[in-house]
């Protein structure tokens, strides 16, 4: 299966080339494929904040490379470069508050920095760590794809209709994808009849990115407005809703793109199974429940304007980027460490005590 999955890979969003971080500008897809080069931590932080790069794993990977770029600049300046590098850690940490992969990657880079020995080359050590973070995420995606596909096949061996939300493919990760990785694997095994992709307002990640990724691979996909999801579950024999996650707490609550919570509520009402796919770096065991997750809110103009023109006069906008789905609405959380069915605090703790499967 691994070889077939790798052969099917067509899209990537992050490149580390000759000491430069190259990011595919996802704001312009699918009309334009433009790669932007970043050579400083500040540029990477701005790219994360402005959503040049998005998706929790991809944000974490980009931040890790941002620290490499920051270290290069601080070392060139001389003096106490480690103290100066703390400003780059802070700048990157402030770029997006909800995706825990960002903080996980930064903590891993800081830990590696603190473990350096006398005689180590700081830049080489940090670069190797960032590359390891990137490669590990890609391997985790391949493992999760297999595990999630097996869950789908276990329920029903014939082709199924699946609903997904936002974008969780290669564009959101170090390669291949989380929820879309599972969908890709299921397609290769003949388990997909059709994928229904929520458009995902207001940034339209579903229509611009997910539909584009799936169509490029010949996977049958239909786009729907977000508010059609319950109707689809009622009329189109949807068997699974499969989504990613930006943060998962110790009890199994899941923060993901706004609209995920209502999908889970509707899925339970219609008897549709609900799967969350995310690497263990997304799990924050320091937070007891979803009530503790900071929810990012973005500029209301994302709702009030279309193409730079105001469409709703003299009103305010409420624009949270994420919501929290309670664990009791989730059938399975799939990670590279294994699968947790009907997640709760005890099962999540058991999962995190396991070694990685890949």
UniProtKB/Swiss-Prot annotation:
Record pathway: Amino-acid biosynthesis; L-methionine biosynthesis via salvage pathway; L-methionine from S-methyl-5-thio-alpha-D-ribose 1-phosphate: step 1/6
Transmembrane segments: none
Site annotation Transition state stabilizer: residues: 166
E.C. number(s) listed in UniProt: 5.3.1.23
Keywords, comma-separated and alphabetical: Amino-acid biosynthesis, Isomerase, Methionine biosynthesis
UniProt-annotated catalytic positions: 246 (proton donor)
Gene Ontology BP terms: L-methionine salvage from methylthioadenosine
SUPFAM superfamilies (alphabetical): NagB/RpiA/CoA transferase-like
Enzyme category, top tier: isomerase
One MF annotation (Gene Ontology) recorded for this entry: S-methyl-5-thioribose-1-phosphate isomerase activity
Catalytic activity from the UniProt record: 5-(methylsulfanyl)-alpha-D-ribose 1-phosphate = 5-(methylsulfanyl)-D-ribulose 1-phosphate
UniProt: substrate binding residues: 54-56, 96, 205, 256-257
Function recorded in the entry: Catalyzes the interconversion of methylthioribose-1-phosphate (MTR-1-P) into methylthioribulose-1-phosphate (MTRu-1-P).
Family, per entry: Belongs to the eIF-2B alpha/beta/delta subunits family. MtnA subfamily.
Protein name per its UniProtKB record: Methylthioribose-1-phosphate isomerase
Gene: mtnA
